Amino acid sequence: MSTAAFHISSLLEKMTSSDKDFRFMATSDLMSELQKDSIQLDEDSERKVVKMLLRLLEDKNGEVQNLAVKCLGPLVVKVKEYQVETIVDTLCTNMRSDKEQLRDIAGIGLKTVLSELPPAATGSGLATNVCRKITGQLTSAIAQQEDVAVQLEALDILSDMLSRLGVPLGAFHASLLHCLLPQLSSPRLAVRKRAVGALGHLAAACSTDLFVELADHLLDRLPGPRVPTSPTAIRTLIQCLGSVGRQAGHRLGAHLDRLVPLVEDFCNLDDDELRESCLQAFEAFLRKCPKEMGPHVPNVTSLCLQYIKHDPNYNYDSDEDEEQMETEDSEFSEQESEDEYSDDDDMSWKVRRAAAKCIAALISSRPDLLPDFHCTLAPVLIRRFKEREENVKADVFTAYIVLLRQTQPPKGWLEAMEEPTQTGSNLHMLRGQVPLVVKALQRQLKDRSVRARQGCFSLLTELAGVLPGSLAEHMPVLVSGIIFSLADRSSSSTIRMDALAFLQGLLGTEPAEAFHPHLPILLPPVMACVADSFYKIAAEALVVLQELVRALWPLHRPRMLDPEPYVGEMSAVTLARLRATDLDQEVKERAISCMGHLVGHLGDRLGDDLEPTLLLLLDRLRNEITRLPAIKALTLVAVSPLQLDLQPILAEALHILASFLRKNQRALRLATLAALDALAQSQGLSLPPSAVQAVLAELPALVNESDMHVAQLAVDFLATVTQAQPASLVEVSGPVLSELLRLLRSPLLPAGVLAAAEGFLQALVGTRPPCVDYAKLISLLTAPVYEQAVDGGPGLHKQVFHSLARCVAALSAACPQEAASTASRLVCDARSPHSSTGVKVLAFLSLAEVGQVAGPGHQRELKAVLLEALGSPSEDVRAAASYALGRVGAGSLPDFLPFLLEQIEAEPRRQYLLLHSLREALGAAQPDSLKPYAEDIWALLFQRCEGAEEGTRGVVAECIGKLVLVNPSFLLPRLRKQLAAGRPHTRSTVITAVKFLISDQPHPIDPLLKSFIGEFMESLQDPDLNVRRATLAFFNSAVHNKPSLVRDLLDDILPLLYQETKIRRDLIREVEMGPFKHTVDDGLDVRKAAFECMYSLLESCLGQLDICEFLNHVEDGLKDHYDIRMLTFIMVARLATLCPAPVLQRVDRLIEPLRATCTAKVKAGSVKQEFEKQDELKRSAMRAVAALLTIPEVGKSPIMADFSSQIRSNPELAALFESIQKDSASAPSTDSMELS
């Protein structure tokens, strides 16, 4: 017998003792053993433990009973299934015992066992088998109404089972429904309440037929409001419908037109409990079926407005003293009794609370009605801030906060530049409400109730975030409220932290001048909080003090407030926190950060305290725990424009920082490099040379491609040091350059690192005398290309040539006197017949950059060389020469542009390359310098719009787009006219040209483009397929980059867009390829473009979409071509995250095409490509399934549950699903999709 088995055997023996203490201790020890992961019971031990614990459930001692029932939880996952069934059978029998205590213990035991069983989603069938076993016994217990206690326990357990395992119990759903429905008529409230909960869970999991039966039963039982019926019966039915709405509202949509008018009528009956139930049902319907509730929104809004004020027992005075209320006598009849309405009978607060929650659901589910809500709901909510019941007041605040969040304008530069009309109107209305809100909250901010004040702070924080600056004129009221809460030591610390957090937010949203008059009374309580003994308050107060310093005495603006009266106290209280050694880590870090801000912003006013403070920062720099915040604080001090004297700490700080560069901790390295760069910029020649050498010795190891960000900061620092102390670079320039040149040969070089390298190279040759000779640097840069030409080594990546060319140009710009000779040498290399392809490519790319610096010395020769290269057999040489011709031409338009236009006319075979050159010239030249040539270019381009090659037409379109930017107000109307005048290829080219006018950055053409965009979008009705495809690509670009251009047009555009998602049989044809027939769908590219537009709309215009209509077309796409299915799978996944409620309504229809894709088989004998395509389709479909499974209630769908079970039972699908879940966990941010 193993040790564990022997120990358990001895415990079982003790459990038979007559001494209750022995039995209790033995059961407690058994509990400890069962909770160990390592314990394994043999079959005999299992049987004995189960038998003993079931026996102890009937123990005479209650404490032993309770401990035994707790042991069942860990036991059921350690024993075999038949033992679990034995436990469950015994518990079910005990539930029907005559002994009340045993019944109670059995009920608790069943709940414990069910809660510990592994869920069905894990693939274990244990829970399902156990639940099936006890369902029959539970239904019989519920049906026999002899013992209400047994009924209640059984209903509780059944409700719990249905919530966790509703779908696997499908075989019992019909019997459960017929068992539960009669309980709605039970005379006992508790039975009715539990039956309502169980029916809600059943409604979410049952089949469609059973759900219809349930809904019809409930609706048929609902009488008309004038039919005499028991109020209790009506209440129960409405509560049941509300429960069904909450659990399975997505299935109730089809019944709402019949149901909602009845519930509206019942709301008007004089029964507050019934009103509460009706409003709760409306809330559920609005959240789960917002589209179907659309026609009923006006009536529901009216009822909410009526009942949020429903307080028959009180009269709120209308004068300023809103806290004094006056009670009136009133009669209230409830269930045929006529008693005086007293506070004890007052149920009206529940009605008001339900109305407030329903209003919150209204606002969140119908963002399209926001302007109406601002007019109708907002004033009423503001007036109800005076609500006397704390719970109701909290929900009123929540409802107004939901309104604020819906009003929040979309984030990003575009909306900041140009608010959409609707958003601007909403913000304007909200701005008018601000004085009313502040007035309504003035007394609440000093309310005795902590919860009321917390609600005020939350609401005002949201308001400040939506309308920054709007609270400035109300600062006296707000400061008074903040001080009241900061001084409140009688309540919990939470309210003081909330007040500090609110103040911190205000400092970020309101202008600094608003705080100036209040600082004398505001600063003392903040500093008292800094010194508070509770670490969380101290940490929060230090952040506020830091924000005060940053906001009131900004670095780069004149000081509008004299800091002298405050700086001493602020410094003293922060230093006290900084010096303490036994502090919480968070307080230490925030004290260091706060001191960094104090020194950086007000160091010139610290006087004699400055040096001790700096030394204290240096001490924190030595400490491993505080070194990271100390580095950041030192950086703040270094970048300060106050030019503080850092000599007392400089040498030692540099040596410490140098040691950090050796640490294998990325965050530390990045912070250290930022600090070093700041110190080099601010201190320059003051840096001790020996300390600088110690730092520089660590840098070569950091300049490599293993961490590009670290490399970029290291090179930036090198450039700064080169300018500040050139002599320091003498010893390390060799190793550093060696690493930098290796880095420049990386094909993955980011733009930031390249820019840093250019700056460093310019610094090296820009010093006097230069640290490294210009000619030597050029030689080092170009050596890899020339060496490759000699030894025939592996070719460099194309991107490397561009990087090297940029560096050559940077050096030429830093040494203009050398530029001409460099250009001459490059021309020779490009012309030489002995030069390799790589040398020529580098020469042309370098000329493209250097040519604009070198001047006109070699232009004639250069033209000839470039033209000759356009005929090179090497595609890379031709492309580089084309690029160089355009870039050099942009620097000398009078010489090059007429020549380039002549060549385009004269050389039709080289037209594509020459048009690329023209595109580069148009993009690089100044608009004003191009105006004299605009007409000639315009005519030339439109002559080439009808070219046969689509690639050439694409370049022509891009050239037209760049040309329009030269003179938008004149050329954009001309471009629009070409739509009517041109043939199909011309129309397509014009639309593509307009696409190139849209960038992801603000541009002066945007307002003009917006005024014309509707006319360009009319091309969606063009009879030509290619024109419609080009228009969809243009629309997609607008939606993706500048959604405000098209938002106002969506009502007209969306029907046309959806039309393009349909498969058109007249565009499908058969093509014979030898003995085979091949189907060609000419409409595929247009459909694909339409679905790409739909995806982009999800990201930027979600609020303007009718998601139910949108989903109709997504469903069609799920059965379309491979490319479109891939797109719609991604859309389904995104929709599951963005708007789960409407997706849940359609989940049964969405699952079938996903299942079909996941289970599809490739025909035997298919090529490898077909297998790869099918695998990719399966992965994409499974990602969509995984996203659908994140919707909280989706598991209750029978079809989804069936498919989940199919996935688990199929090894291939299970492995795929597991792989996708791992991918999602490791890379959660997969929201965006690159679309061509």
UniProtKB/Swiss-Prot annotation:
GO BP annotations listed: positive regulation of DNA-templated transcription; protein ubiquitination; SCF complex assembly
Chief subcellular location: nucleus
HEAT repeat segments: 2-39, 44-81, 83-119, 129-167, 171-208, 210-246, 254-291, 327-368, 372-409, 432-469, 517-554, 565-604, 608-645, 648-685, 690-727, 731-770, 772-813, 857-894, 896-931, 933-966, 967-1003, 1007-1044, 1048-1084, 1105-1141, 1157-1194, 1204-1236
Modified how: Ubiquitinated and targeted for proteasomal degradation.
Segments of skewed composition (Acidic residues): 317-346
Keyword match Iron: no
Expressed in which tissues: Expressed in epididymis (at protein level).
InterPro entries registered for this protein in UniProt: ARM-like, ARM-type_fold, CAND1/CAND2, TATA-bd_TIP120
Record-level GO cellular component terms: cytosol; nucleus
Keywords recorded for this protein, A-Z: Acetylation, Nucleus, Repeat, Transcription, Ubl conjugation, Ubl conjugation pathway
Keyword Acetylation: yes
Ranges where the record places region Disordered: 315-346
Residue numbers carrying N-acetylserine: S2
A single MF term (Gene Ontology): TBP-class protein binding
Compartments, record wording: Nucleus
One Pfam short name: TIP120
Role played: Probable assembly factor of SCF (SKP1-CUL1-F-box protein) E3 ubiquitin ligase complexes that promotes the exchange of the substrate-recognition F-box subunit in SCF complexes, thereby playing a key role in the cellular repertoire of SCF complexes.
Quaternary state and interactors: Binds TBP, CNOT3 and UBE3C.
Family: Belongs to the CAND family.
Name of the featured protein: Cullin-associated NEDD8-dissociated protein 2
Naturally occurring in which organism (per UniProt): Homo sapiens
